[in-house]
Amino acid sequence: MSKTLQSRKSLSGKLRRAANTRIVVEGNLALSIANDLLSALDVEPFNSEEDCISRSPKFGISPDQFRNSYLRAEIMSKYDSFSLGINTEAVAWEKFLAAEAECAKTNLRLYRPNYNEDFNFSLGETCIHMARRKIVKLLGDSVPFEAVLRHCRFSGGATTTNSRLYGHPSFKFALAQECTPRAVPYVQALKACTNMDLGITKVSPFNKAVTVPKNSKTDRCIAIEPGWNMFFQLGIGGVIREKLHLWNIDLNDQTINQVRAYSGSCSNELATVDLSSASDTISLALVELLLPPAWFKVLTDLRSRRGMLPDGRIITYEKISSMGNGFTFELESLIFAALARSLCELLNLQPSSVTVYGDDIILPSDACSSLIEVFSYVGFRTNEKKTFFDGPFRESCGKHYFMGVDVTPFYIRHRIVSPSDLILVLNQMYRWATIDGVWDPRVYPVYTKYRRLLPDILRRNVVPDGYGDGALVGSVLTSPFAENRGWVRRVPMIIDKKKDRVRDERGSYLYELWSLQQLECDSEFPFNGSLVVGTNDGVCTYRHRERVSTAISDSVGAYDIVWIPCSSRVLAPYGDFRRHEGSILK
């Protein structure tokens, strides 16, 4: 073994041991970091845990003052470990059932419109009629099932059959999934056209409504769908996503809304609109009024009509779908865009000036008040705290601007118990404090104070920004651990340690086949692939592919070290971590 490799293995061992230590301090470390940072910025620190989640920023001040005030309002707002004495699950269910009650009222109002004596349409009714014509023109009268099938897939989450631990698509192909009664014909048609041995465990008339953590004030309600329903829902969502490109709406790109939020903060000509409980307030009646009959039938065939609550109660949904449904995001984007574009046309504004990303909506400021009126009529509630149409502040898709200045805050979401947790917070602080390329001198002492809590070897290991948060961000030229080999520079990073878990061989091959048809069959469907799994070694007969791995890696709650190639230049803040080929040194 070469000296270089021996040295690297020795260093990896030291870094690994340091990464798996615990950070032990008195009190709440996350709150201490936030308060020290606010004090350094000459902003009032938090007086209590309740104070962390109940403040609003101050307007009418300079961009720098607003940026600091806004950081105070946001930094701990998503922290999930405060002990506030709030039953977060009960709060979530109360909100969920309230949204259902609102949808019931909306259904009654839209199915039985109350026209006046002169039979004049309200603004909301007029927008519904215009939006329907726009949607029919965009989607077409019939559903393109071949296109839908190309987008169908299993997600990586839980289903009513598979827990999250077995959420990988290969497990879902291996284990027959449930579906609702009206979705059975779709599964049968899929089985007939693909030659794949697909099965249904049972026909389930409902999904499972559950809660997941959100913050210290409330949980979030989602629905776990039957597996086959989710499979086809994602197909419908994929087609709608493609169709929206005709309106210059790209649901794969958040930067469109982010750039327009910047523009709105400079010119005041664009408004950013956000909705409360958007996915839980899309009523059945609204979808039936807006979508062509064929599309509405498919959506209702593939949705879960009823849901089971944790206490065993069965409810009949008044909404079309909820978070957890595979087409909710695309459907809500379509509806919001259609209504906003129709309103702009009525007001003689450019419909093309509307962009949406889920419930993040941007349109001309002159149309914002009218849009709020239209949304109220069709059952949507505008989030007043996150809707801006007049003034210097705009926020959309995670970017926040004040008079054209980037004031995007960072968030401390969880307890800090490991070096990896602290590195994440310190890197967020670094990016926030160096947004203009140099350190804010007020913040640097706070950064160095808490950096000392890290083991010495982790304090010295730095990587350029853009490669994730597996090490402190900084200039790689100052790292004593970077290896230079010709044109390649390698640096060590902390990653979650994973352990291989064997998955079903047949499910692995079925998943591989399905993935291949999605990549290679742009226009030809059905895909009549074949699969042969022998009793001894199992070989996929599709083309000349290598044998498929039948193992899947799961985190084991510890950390490991990987060496990755990187550039010596510092990338822009918030860069994406692109995983390079690197070997994990055992």
UniProtKB/Swiss-Prot annotation:
Mg(2+) 2 binds at residues 274, 359-360. Pfam families: RNA_replicase_B (PF03431). Binds 2 Mg(2+) per subunit, Ca(2+) is used in crystallization to prevent RNA polymerase activity. Its cofactor is Mg(2+). Keywords: Magnesium, Metal-binding, Nucleotide-binding, Nucleotidyltransferase, RNA-binding, RNA-directed RNA polymerase, Transferase, Viral RNA replication. GO terms for biological process: viral RNA genome replication. One of its GO terms (molecular function) is RNA binding. It comes from the Viruses. InterPro entries: DNA/RNA_pol_sf (IPR043502), RNA-dir_Rpol_cat_phage (IPR007096), RNArep_beta (IPR005093). It catalyses: RNA(n) + a ribonucleoside 5'-triphosphate = RNA(n+1) + diphosphate. Mg(2+) 1 binds at residues 274, 359-360. The keyword Transferase applies. This is RNA-directed RNA polymerase subunit beta. It comes from Qbeta virus (strain MX1). The lineage of its organism: Viruses, Riboviria, Orthornavirae, Lenarviricota, Leviviricetes.
